[in-house]
Swiss-Prot record:
It is found in: Nucleus; Chromosome, Centromere, Kinetochore. GO terms for cellular component: Ndc80 complex; nucleus. It comes from the Eukaryota. This is Kinetochore protein Nuf2-A. Its main location: nucleus. InterPro entries: Kinetochore_Nuf2_N (IPR005549), Nuf2_N_sf (IPR038275). GO terms for biological process: attachment of mitotic spindle microtubules to kinetochore; cell division; kinetochore organization; meiotic chromosome segregation; mitotic spindle organization. Component of the NDC80 complex, which is composed of ndc80, cdca1, spbc24 and spbc25. The NDC80 complex interacts with mis12 and zwint.
């Protein structure tokens, strides 16, 4: 009791909560503080627990009064009166651990106490508050899930449309497949040639870069050696200054010579630095050359496409010129044949007039037959749509009935298991009760025999 995970509510707050959220009608009006504290009424507590269990487990009132009919019970009239209380005990033993109340006892329902009732009801109220907040979050998740499903459907539809467009764009028409294969083979050959040239140039540049790096390392090594020599010479100069006393002229000539050597060393150092900068620029240029080559490759590909377009245009122009020459020749031959055909046309026109009359009659008959066939097809299509709708409706009803059947089977199976558990518990309790009754009857019979024997002894004494 000291390690609760929920507060103990006052009796007045509990009464207000159950009036507003659990009880209805006259039950809410007649429910007051004295029903649960300090001396709870068992019938009111049982009714309150029943209403709470109805709301939590979605049970009907008739389910609390149901007695399993598939069990062989010795005294069914006793079970009928005890069925609601047994169902309440079973469900409360299952429900209260969810509310963090682990010390439930059947006496809390059969003979409730004030403090234990407040403890249990406070845990139930805390659980109901928590379930209400979680229910709101669950509904929000459901709404977001529905919107996400709708977005997924839209995206799938857009994806399918995009795939259809991609397939249309990627497929090559049959009349252009030969040309496409030829162009792809030419492009592949050009890419191989370009890649081979690029590899050769790349190898040459890499060799030059490696050579420049080795030269640069040698120059740096020489420069470091010269720096070390200058430092040693300066140290030697300082050491010799302290040991040798020279004339001013000799000292001046030596200092001039040393200045000249220092100047030469500085010039050599400057030259090496310039060469280092030059080689560094060459290395950077070699690194940048790769991006330029890639750009040149792209430009070459663009030039190849432009050349291909130019070749196609030239072929079309040549083909059109050939067609023009052929058409001129045909025009000359046709001009000769024109005179002959004019005479033939006059004869043919007369025949065509007769044939046109016959064709008009046939066309009218054909249009009439076509219209009749279209009307019959439209009627058949309407009937087909009606039948299809009926079939879809019947299939939907079948699916619904199958789902309801499965749900009903699951609920009946669960109810059957629960009833069997209650009956086994109740049978064990009845067997214990029968044993106790039998023992009590045996004890009373023994006492009766003892009293009769004592009375007989007293009567015999008299």
């Amino acid at each position: 009791m000291d390690k609760l995970t929920f507060p103990i509510f006052p009796a007045a707050d509990l009464v207000n909560f159950f009036r507003q959220n659990i009880l209805t009608g006259t039950e809410a009006k007649n429910f007051n503080k004295n029903d649960i504290f300090p001396n709870p009424k068992p019938e009111m507590v049982q009714k309150l627990y029943m209403r709470i269990l109805q709301q939590v487990f979605n049970y009907g009132v008739e389910q609390f009064y149901m007695v399993p009919m598939d069990l062989d019970i010795q005294y069914p009239h006793l079970v009928e009166g005890f069925a609601p209380v047994a169902n309440i005990l079973k469900l409360m033993a299952r429900f209260l651990p969810m509310c963090r109340v682990y010390d439930f006892h059947p006496s809390d329902v059969l003979n409730p106490k004030g403090k234990r009732t407040l403890h249990s009801l406070s845990g139930i109220v805390n659980f109901l508050h928590f379930s209400a907040t979680r229910k709101e979050v669950y509904f929000e998740y459901c709404s977001s899930y529905k919107s996400a499903l709708e977005n997924v459907r839209q995206l799938q539809k857009a994806n399918q449309e995009a795939e259809i467009k991609i397939e249309k764009l990627t497929t090559v028409p049959p009349e252009q497949q030969a040309e496409f294969k030829a162009l792809s083979s030419e492009i592949h050959d050009l890419q191989q040639i370009i890649s081979q040239e690029y590899r050769a140039k790349d190898v040459a540049f890499q060799e030059k870069i490696a050579q420049r790096k080795t030269e640069f390392a040698e120059k740096n090594k020489r420069l470091n050696e010269q720096k070390l020599a200058i430092a040693t010479m300066k140290e030697e100069q300082e050491r010799m200054k302290s040991q040798i006393v020279e004339s001013p002229e000799q000292r001046k000539s030596k200092t001039e010579r040393m200045k000249e050597t220092v100047h030469r060393l500085k010039q050599a150092r400057q030259e090496t630095n310039d060469k280092c900068d030059y080689y560094r620029d060459r290395v950077a240029f070699a690194c940048m050359w790769q991006t330029d080559v890639q750009g040149y490759l792209k430009k070459l590909q663009g030039i190849d496409t432009n050349l291909e377009i130019h070749r196609k245009i030239r072929e079309e122009i040549r083909h059109s010129e050939e067609q023009v020459v052929n058409l001129n020749l045909e025009l000359k031959s046709l001009s000769n044949e024109d005179a002959q055909l004019k005479r033939i046309i006059l004869v043919k026109k007369e025949k065509l007039a007769k044939v046109d009359i016959k064709n008009k009659k046939k066309q009218e008959d054909f249009n009439q037959q076509k219209q009749e066939i279209l009307e019959v097809c439209s009627r058949i299509q309407e009937k087909r749509q009606v039948v299809h709708g009926r079939v879809a409706q019947v299939l939907q009803e079948i699916q619904q009935t199958i789902g309801k059947k499965e749900q009903l089977l699951e609920t009946t199976e669960a109810g059957k298991k629960k009833c069997q558990e209650v009956i086994t518990d109740f049978r064990a309790a009845l067997e214990k009760y029968h044993d106790s009754l039998q023992k009590a009857s045996e004890r009373s019979a023994d006492r009766r025999r003892e009293k009769i024997a004592e009375l007989n002894r007293r009567l015999s004494r008299r």
